[in-house]
Amino acid sequence: MVAQAEQDLGIKLFAVHRLDSPTSGLLILAKSAVAAKQFTELFTAHKVQKYYLALAKGKPKKKQGWVIGDMAKSRRSMFKLLRTKENPAITQFFSLSVSEGLRLYLLKPHSGKTHQLRVALASLGVPILGDDLYGGMAADRCYLHAYCLHFRYGDEATGWRDYAYRDVPTQGEHFAAEGVIEALVEWFEPNTLAWPAKGD
């Protein structure tokens, strides 16, 4: 992905975070080593708020709240959620019914574990639509999308600015459903929503 962007733009780029291979959407690439270092520090300090969209079939164990637990490698490159919380994966989420048996999830990870969101939804009994690895129903794609990024960036000399980037998914027939489009109007600015409190 980075190599393709470098070729398209004709400049050297630096990756500062990653997306799981089946995930579409927003990815920050820095144009200098200095900017890459700054963004890496922001991500490490969890100062970049990331929001993802996912679709899943079925009824979840809960419709909103938190998924918190340690993660461990399982079989076939999979991970599983544990009951322990020593170095947990932490995910906050909302969901809305968008059609019969299909729910849209707005996910806010507070940690950056591999497969974190895929494991979180699987642990709720609703693996992501099209996520073959975790038992999602077959579909034309894996319905996980990096939807929004919100962060403050700058320095003392030039000042600090708040940035918000949003990318509405355009690939996948289920993302084009009327119920999804209506939900995205409600979730247009994820950082302003009243997110579920811990314990929900």
Per-region residue spans from a language model:
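RNA pseudouridine synthases
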Residues: 1-90, 94-100, 143, 170-176, ...
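An acidic site on a long C-lobe helix of protein kinase domains
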Residues: 18, 111-113
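Short beta-strand segments enriched for Tyr within beta-sheet-rich domains
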Residues: 39, 113-121
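A generic structural motif
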Residues: 57, 96, 108, 152-154
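Short histidine-centered loop motifs in beta-beta connectors
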Residues: 101, 105-108
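Active-site lining segments that contact anionic ligands and/or coordinate catalytic metals
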Residues: 102, 114-116, 144-146
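Pseudouridine synthases involved in rRNA/tRNA modification
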Residues: 120-200
